[in-house]
Amino acid sequence: GTARRHSDPEADRAVRVALANDPKEQSENVMIVDLVRNDLSRHAAKGSVHVEELFGVYSFRNLHQLISTVSAELREGHSSIAALRDCFPMGSMTGAPKIRAMELIEACENRKRGLYSGAIGYFAPEGDFDFNVVIRSIQYNAVNRLVSYTAGSAITARAEADREYDECLLKAESMRLAVGSRQ
């Protein structure tokens, strides 16, 4: 869930509360959390998968974002690389059911996602790792001299096309301004 910030503090607080309590945004977030819990459980120690935060509202310069955090301890004998690999593609980028959603993405999108919806991070020598899904990032192709960025939203049974499109524009706004585009 994403919502535009307001310059008026009272209106901004109201937007935060509305985002945190929006049933559609909550159901999308729960779907993603369930996918992450399922993916992590394949390599997690028994009972170690925890939802540390559900429906946290984080405020950024121009938007509020609904964020949840899931963690797990790696099961003995399982590698962190295998655990990470088996989380891909990320449910937050595909939706559910994951396999069918990927088939629809392949059929509907006219180009590969490339780095967008992939991950960047690190593995530490002691086995810890931290990765972040690549969203709202600007990419530059030196060969084609092309700057690009991508934004997306969730298509669910309760989704309204105009609202989802507006959410994409909001998510892309900072990138658009960073590259100097007016449109």
Regions found by a protein language model. Give the residues of each.
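Extended alpha-helical targeting/anchoring segments
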Residues: 1-183
